[in-house]
Amino acid sequence: GSATGTLRVITRDGRIEGGEAPAPARLNVLDGSGHPAVPSSGYAQFEGQNGRVFFYSPGVVELSVPAGPVLVGAVRGLDTPEVSETVEVRAGEVTEVEILLESVWDPKSAGFLSGDHHFHLNYGGPFGLDPEDLPLMMRGENLDVATPLLANLHTRFEDQKLWGWEKADGLPLIRFGQEVRSHFLGHVALLDTRTLFWPWIWGPGYQVYGSDDRPNSDPLGHARSQGGIGGYVHPVRDADPFSPENVASPPALLVVD
């Protein structure tokens, strides 16, 4: 096999102790042949839109990689442009690279928190995540608030046992929400409710509740009655919602609600 060396990646953020302290980040590492490299432990992910394999670093991480050139890409949320560095890893040695990430804007200094209100902790696949896995990911994305949504996968009601779990002991903050799917009427997210809405799904083609006839105002009203927030998720199909092909893509009840 190929000779290998150890790559140590240190990421820093100019907003954290002036860039002196290591900062969590999302990393994408490619060896000289273009193959992704990941740590020996932890959770690696595949991002299908751009074809990247990535993982989250707490600020300092080591990887075993083939000797030779290695490309390291690092980013920390939407307000931090990606920084890429190519380093020459020597066989049998530890090669260190430091990456300083500079933000284009500091939301906290302007009085804002960053958040992600539509994602699912588990949604099929062989690897199950626990809520405790989220803080590292959130810090790597510079996220302050997250509301992972419970949702169905066909007739499976994913992560229902986690309803009520929350992290409220300081940033990042995490509380579970719910995605309700009413087929062509549009999917809605319910945030900060005290009870789950039932049913989670209905409408033509679903394996259960296929003949139910109810508007999305029912789950939205459920959220409002409990002091929560309801809204439509992914109301358009892609990044160009105003293209002629997407004229008919908004869900049927979006405008009505």
Where would I find each of the regions flagged by the language model?
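Short, ordered, surface-exposed loop/turn motifs in non-cytosolic proteins
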Residues: 15-45
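Short, solvent-exposed S/T- and G/P-enriched segments that are highly enriched in secreted/extracellular
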Residues: 36-65
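Catalytic cores of extracellular degradative/oxidative enzymes
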Residues: 112-257
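Surface-exposed loop/turn motifs at beta-strand-loop junctions within extracellular Ig-like
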Residues: 13-15, 76-78, 103
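A short, solvent-exposed beta-strand micro-motif common in secreted/extracellular proteins
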Residues: 51-53, 67-77, 138
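A short, amphipathic beta-strand motif
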Residues: 5-19, 27-29, 70, 99
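Extracellular beta-sheet/turn segments enriched in Thr/Pro/Gly and aliphatic residues
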Residues: 1, 87-108
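Structured interaction patches on ligand/partner-binding surfaces of diverse proteins
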Residues: 55-57, 62-64, 78-96
